[in-house]
């Protein structure tokens, strides 16, 4: 006997624990998903927080209670389908959400008086009912602001799935209550903190809160506009209205039903892509229709389970049989289920035994080829094997299936054969008992609404079928350019070319048979079937109209026909329930205009292709046809072949999260884009020596980059991509045009005038003609964004949107003077060439110089051009490296240096040599004038001596050549007869005194060249030694770093080994 409370609890604890262990998964899942429903923040949550902050605890609890009742009503709608259709289906509520939010915002946008900010203290206050009603309605609308409506919908799915599990329902309710309690307590805490921490009066704080919440609700309404489909009349619908103004019967208001009048699921609101059908075959990989989710109880392993893919045709068939009050006692259901379960178990046992025996045979030593099951295959006489799908011996074990036009679930018999005997249909000997029983029972129906497949067609149906077939024969029906919408009531459009083959088959059957049944209609394609039924229904409407007219005219015999037709038309769903329920995929069955290029402002295509930029025109052939050259934009493709009119904001994989976003990325890869920075010091813990080396290397690399950065092809493309959006192209193209006009007509003319005026002031000849000639040669050509030339005066098409480049041919560079060589100075050039030939040492060098001179002349003939940048610089290629311009002041500096330093020094040298020569010549002239007078008289000797003089002088070095030129000018001023011989003799004496000969001079030059080579070799060796010394100095530091790395890696490996060993022992 239990005498105390602890003993009672200990006794009860054991069954409670066993119950929790048994239902722990459902209990935990219920609490988790119940709590998740309170996380998504909607307008009702915002209203309750506003009520807590502005009107106190009492109004906040009223708002939360409205929120809770609204959410409870949504949960109850899962178990009651009419309430679910009203609340969860978005057709009606979508129209009401936005007007109500805007009305509420208009109501609270301005603070009229401060009495509305006073806290509520009693239930009698009228504001409580308003707050409760607002939060209740907003919760029924079920819009979610943050983070996503998925969390709210998860519980709905699980409640529907586990509605029979009491533990899940109870735990989810507990989790939901806990979440609501937490929300209320957090609201109270927020109110308390704001009241206590506010430095000013709380009434003024309330005014700020009032204003902020009105802004939040307005922003929420705008966000709802972007998410929900707006029921506006589109452009295409307007065109249809204008086209059908003359036809009042086909107006869209009368024909379209709710909710497709406002929300047509076939419109391109969703960002769906258009996929064309194959041009060569009628079979398309795209599904034309999908089966709707249909929920009903079905059997799985002999047990009743909820199936979401139950066949609707079976459900309606069962429903009609139940309505007819027939006792279906043909077979007892329990016997069928028991037999089915037994067969399944026997099959499992057989398979298990078969595998067990095979394993035993393998253990006993049999080969695998002997144990594997062997099958017979059909083959031709030639030895060719049939495919598995065509082989009757293997077709049962083949996974694939043949395409069958009929639905296997319709009540049509495949085994019977139709034979024609005196215009009647007879079945074969194999009778279908189920079919006979159903037909006998259906004949006893009072109201025969359910049509069976083997029943014959009525006269009206046969007439309409023949009319349709004759119409398709006369006019080949084509609906490639029209939109099909069969779920609207105006689906009376023509058939596609693809369905003509089935119409031909039906025509042949009509010709063969006189008695037609509904099976022929079942074999038609879905479009033809719906078209036939719509025509049949329209025919009934027309006969009803005619009968009404006759009735009003006085023919009272039409009353029976009117009543009969009205009963048939009012109940259209019960007429033809033999067809399966399916849903057409929301896509256009018609053929849209899908071209490769989407030219803006023309509207050729119905699909948004990738952006195309016009490059220009290319003239080809004798006819000189203009071919448009195009290119795709370098930007990422934000369009992705979407149909015009679709909502791009609802795309899944193309997220836009930046103001200026160059590339398009999926949100899944955003974490890869934002790479975290790695701190090397925290990971490796390196000493400051290593840090100093890294800092030095960074500084050196930065300095090298700052000197001159060469742009590669990839860099140029990257810069072009950055500029390739409309606003940037607009600004850049205007800047380029301004820069070209400034350069051509303002800057360069000013510089030319300034230069020539200064030359006049310096008493130099101005170079107007040369400068203006070079300025006129400069041509500015307008090009497209990629650099293809368009014209000198005309701009390319859409240059503000697509971009612009300006190419400068023969760019003008200002020169301090022009080096114009006189072509009349030919003898000087000839003498120079003779001198070069006589000099054996410099002969090869001079040949190289002549070749370089000829190459330069060829290069000058090539076209000189550059591209202008937006800042006035010049580049060799679009977005390439900035071109270095020749300096104006550099040649002036060189000239000044020569005039200031080199010329005075050379003049002094020349004067000293002249003085020496004059002294020597005067003395020797006095001594040898009388003795060698006879020699001077003979002119032939003088000519020979003069030639010798020239030969000797050319073989001297550069300094002696200068002396020769200066002395020749002085000596030739004296009489030729007397002074030439004196000059030659003087030179010979000088050479004898100094012992200078030509051979010695050549030897000296060779030695000098050898010395230069030796010096070069020494310099290279010194550089190599310096590098080796630096490497030797850095060796200890590098060794330290490598040792530290090895030490760290060893530590990491040790920790990994210890963890692995500990895990191994824990597992064991």
UniProtKB/Swiss-Prot annotation:
According to its record, what are the GO cellular component terms?
chloroplast inner membrane
Question: Where, by residue number, does the polypeptide cross the bilayer?
Answer: 11-31, 68-88, 92-112, 131-151, 166-186, 213-233
One GO BP annotation is: protein transport
Keyword check for Protein transport, yes or no.
Answer: yes
InterPro entries, sorted: TIC214
Query: How does the entry describe its membrane topology?
Result: Multi-pass membrane protein
Record's subcellular location:
Plastid, Chloroplast inner membrane
User: How would you summarize the oligomeric state and partners of this protein?
Assistant: Part of the Tic complex.
Q: What does this protein do?
A: Involved in protein precursor import into chloroplasts. May be part of an intermediate translocation complex acting as a protein-conducting channel at the inner envelope.
The protein's matches in PANTHER family, at most eight in alphabetical order, are given as: PROTEIN TIC 214, PROTEIN TIC 214-RELATED
What family does the Swiss-Prot or TrEMBL record give for this protein? Belongs to the TIC214 family.
Q: What is this protein called?
A: Putative protein TIC 214 N-terminal part
Organism for this UniProt entry: Marchantia polymorpha (Common liverwort)
């Amino acid at each position: 006997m239990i005498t105390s409370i602890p003993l009672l609890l200990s006794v009860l604890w054991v069954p409670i624990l066993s119950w929790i262990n048994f239902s722990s998964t459902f209990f935990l899942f219920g609490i988790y998903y119940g709590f998740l429903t309170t996380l998504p923040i909607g307008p009702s949550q915002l209203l309750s927080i506003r009520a807590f902050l502005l009107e106190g605890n009492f109004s906040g609890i009223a708002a939360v209670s409205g929120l809770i009742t609204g959410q409870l009503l949504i949960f109850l709608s899962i178990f009651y389908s009419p309430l679910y259709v009203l609340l969860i289906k978005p057709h009606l509520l979508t129209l009401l959400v936005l007007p109500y939010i805007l009305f509420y915002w208009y109501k609270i946008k301005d603070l009229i008086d401060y009495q509305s900010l006073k806290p509520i203290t009693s239930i009698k206050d009228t504001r409580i009912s308003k707050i409760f009603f607002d939060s209740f309605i907003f919760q029924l609308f079920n819009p979610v602001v943050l983070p996503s409506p998925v969390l709210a919908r998860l519980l709905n799915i699980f409640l529907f799935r586990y509605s029979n599990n009491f533990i899940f329902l109870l735990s989810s309710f507990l989790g939901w209550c806990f979440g609501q309690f937490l929300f209320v307590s957090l609201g109270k805490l927020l109110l308390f903190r704001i009241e206590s921490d506010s430095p000013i009066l709380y009434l003024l704080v309330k005014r700020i809160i009032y204003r902020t919440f009105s802004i939040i609700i307005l922003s929420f309404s705008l966000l709802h506009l972007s998410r929900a489909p707006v029921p506006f009349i589109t452009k295409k619908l307007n065109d249809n209205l204008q086209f059908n103004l003359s036809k009042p019967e086909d107006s869209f208001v009368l024909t379209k039903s709710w909710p497709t009048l406002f929300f047509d699921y076939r419109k391109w609101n969703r960002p769906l892509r258009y996929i064309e059908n194959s041009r060569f075959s009628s079979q398309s990989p795209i599904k034309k229709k999908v089966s709707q989710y249909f929920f009903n109880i079905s059997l799985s392993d002999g047990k009743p389970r909820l199936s979401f893919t139950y066949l609707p045709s079976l459900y309606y068939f069962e429903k009609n049989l139940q309505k007819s009050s027939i006792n279906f006692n043909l077979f007892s259901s329990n016997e069928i289920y028991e037999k089915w379960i037994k067969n399944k178990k026997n099959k499992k046992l057989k398979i298990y035994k078969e595998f067990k025996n095979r394993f035993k045979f393998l253990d006993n030593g049999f080969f695998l080829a002997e144990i594997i099951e062997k099958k017979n295959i059909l083959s031709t006489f030639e030895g060719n094997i049939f495919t598995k799908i065509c082989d009757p011996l293997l077709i049962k074990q083949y996974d694939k299936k043949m395409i069958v036009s009929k639905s296997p679930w319709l009540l049509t018999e495949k085994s019977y054969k139709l034979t024609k005997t005196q215009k009647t249909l007879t079945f074969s000997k194999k009778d279908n008992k189920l079919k006979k029983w159903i037909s006998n029972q259906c004949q006893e129906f009072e109201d025969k609404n359910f049509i069976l497949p083997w029943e014959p067609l009525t006269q009206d149906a046969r007439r309409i079928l023949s009319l349709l077939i004759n119409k398709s024969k006369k006019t080949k029906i084509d609906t490639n350019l029209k939109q099909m919408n069969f779920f609207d009531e105006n689906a009376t459009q023509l058939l596609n070319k693809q369905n003509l083959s089935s119409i031909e088959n039906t025509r042949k059957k009509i010709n063969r048979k006189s008695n037609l049944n509904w099976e022929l209609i079942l074999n038609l394609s879905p479009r033809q079937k719906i078209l036939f039924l719509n025509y049949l229904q329209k025919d009934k409407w027309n006969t009803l109209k005619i009968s009404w007219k006759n009735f009003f005219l006085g023919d009272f015999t039409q009353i029976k026909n009117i009543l009969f037709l009205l009963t048939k038309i009012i109940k259209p769903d019960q007429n033809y329930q033999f067809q399966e329920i399916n849903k057409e995929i929301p896509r256009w069955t018609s053929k849209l205009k899908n071209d490769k290029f989407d030219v803006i402002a023309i509207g050729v295509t119905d699909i948004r292709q990738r952006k195309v930029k016009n490059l220009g025109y290319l003239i080809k052939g004798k006819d000189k046809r203009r071919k448009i050259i195009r290119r795709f934009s370098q930007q990422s493709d934000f369009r992705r072949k979407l149909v015009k009119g679709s909502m791009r904001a609802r795309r899944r994989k193309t997220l836009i999260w930046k103001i200026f976003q160059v590339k398009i990325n999926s949100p899944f890869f955003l974490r890869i884009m934002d790479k975290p920075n790695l701190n090397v010091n925290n990971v490796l813990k390196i000493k400051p020596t290593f840090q100093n080396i890294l800092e030095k290397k960074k500084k050196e690399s930065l300095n090298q980059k700052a000197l001159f950065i060469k742009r590669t092809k990839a860099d140029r493309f990257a810069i072009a991509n950055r500029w390739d959006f409309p606003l940037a192209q607009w600004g850049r193209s205007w800047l380029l045009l301004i820069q070209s006009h400034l350069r051509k007509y303002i800057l360069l003319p000013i510089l030319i005038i300034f230069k020539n005026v200064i030359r006049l002031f310096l008493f130099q000849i101005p170079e107007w003609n040369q400068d203006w000639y070079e300025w006129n040669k400069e041509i500015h050509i307008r090009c497209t964004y990629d650099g293809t030339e368009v014209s000198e005066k005309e701009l390319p098409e859409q240059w503000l949107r697509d971009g612009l480049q300006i190419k400068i041919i023969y760019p003008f560079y200002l020169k301090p003077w022009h080096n114009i060589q006189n072509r009349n100075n030919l003898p000087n050039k000839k003498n120079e060439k003779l001198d070069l030939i006589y000099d054996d040492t410099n002969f090869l060098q001079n040949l190289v110089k002549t070749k370089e001179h000829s190459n330069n002349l060829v290069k000058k003939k090539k076209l000189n051009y550059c591209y202008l940048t937006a800042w006035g610089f010049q580049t060799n290629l679009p977005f390439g490296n900035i071109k270095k311009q020749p300096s104006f002041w550099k040649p002036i500096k060189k000239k000044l240096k020569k005039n200031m330093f080199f010329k005075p020094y050379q003049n002094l040298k020349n004067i000293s040599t002249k003085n020496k020569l004059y002294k020597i010549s005067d003395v020797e002239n006095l001594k040898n004038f009388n003795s060698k007078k006879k020699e001077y008289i003979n002119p032939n000797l003088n000519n020979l001596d003069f030639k010798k003089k020239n030969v000797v002088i050319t073989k001297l070095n550069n300094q002696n050549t200068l002396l020769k030129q200066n002395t020749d000018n002085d000596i030739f001023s004296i009489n030729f007869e007397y002074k030439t011989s004196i000059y030659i003799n003087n030179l010979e004496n000088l050479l004898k005194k100094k012992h200078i000969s030509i051979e010695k001079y050549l030897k000296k030059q060779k030695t000098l060249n050898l010395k230069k080579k030796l010096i070069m070799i020494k310099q290279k060796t010194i550089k190599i030694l310096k590098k080796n010394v630096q490497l030797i100095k850095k060796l200890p530091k590098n060794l330290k770093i490598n040792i530290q790395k090895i030490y760290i890696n060893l530590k990491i490996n040790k920790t990994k080994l210890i963890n692995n060993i500990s895990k191994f022992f824990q597992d064991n």
